[in-house]
Amino acid sequence: MKTKSFLRREEYKMLATLSIDGPILDIGGSKKSGYHELIKGTHTITTGNIDASYGTDLIFDAQDAWPFPDGSYAGVLFVNVLEHLYDYRTALTESARVLKKGGTLAGVVPFMFNVHGSPADHFRYTRFTIERMLADAGYEHIEVKELGTGAFSVIYHCLLGFVRWNWLADMLIPLFGGIDRLISAIKPNNRMSQAYMPLGY
């Protein structure tokens, strides 16, 4: 999937590693969400959104009780959604409730990223906060990964408004990412690395 966004490219790489068999619930998604085709496995995807204009299967607020029985889904997706939910605790608790035993929750959230709408932008979470949020909601086997390559991926994102063509992004993203990797190779655990300056998780 072509996109000029460094973060989106990282998100799509992560989603392409997923394999889920069974029904999936995509919170905040739409029928036009291009990342659905990246997920491997035999599944159907139902989308739920607060905004009907997104072209969604179901309209409901993820901050309220979800209209599904316990253990209804093999997978739940939160793709760039949790930062928009003021009551993220209810959303995470409900996601754990509707997942089948052994089901998969997969999500991405921005960190070093501009304030954005849809409909409002409330939070930025660190790795430590995400791990605790998920544990508090009842999740086990939690894995959180940084997205981006470090400070230069953040710099690229700040310049994104000037990158008007995908072909230019195809040149600049490997360049900026390569600089980050070179810095980390010379000085591992530096404070410009993705561990300290992630675009997201």
Predicted features and spans:
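Class I SAM-dependent methyltransferase Rossmann-like catalytic core
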Residues: 1-18
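S-adenosyl-L-methionine-dependent methyltransferase catalytic module, highlighting the catalytic core
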Residues: 86-90, 94, 104-201
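Residue-level marker of intrinsically disordered, low-complexity segments enriched
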Residues: 5, 18, 76-77, 140-142
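Conserved SAM-binding loop
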Residues: 17-116, 127-131, 198-200
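Short N-terminal micro-motifs specific to bacterial/archaeal maturation
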Residues: 2, 6, 56, 79-82, ...
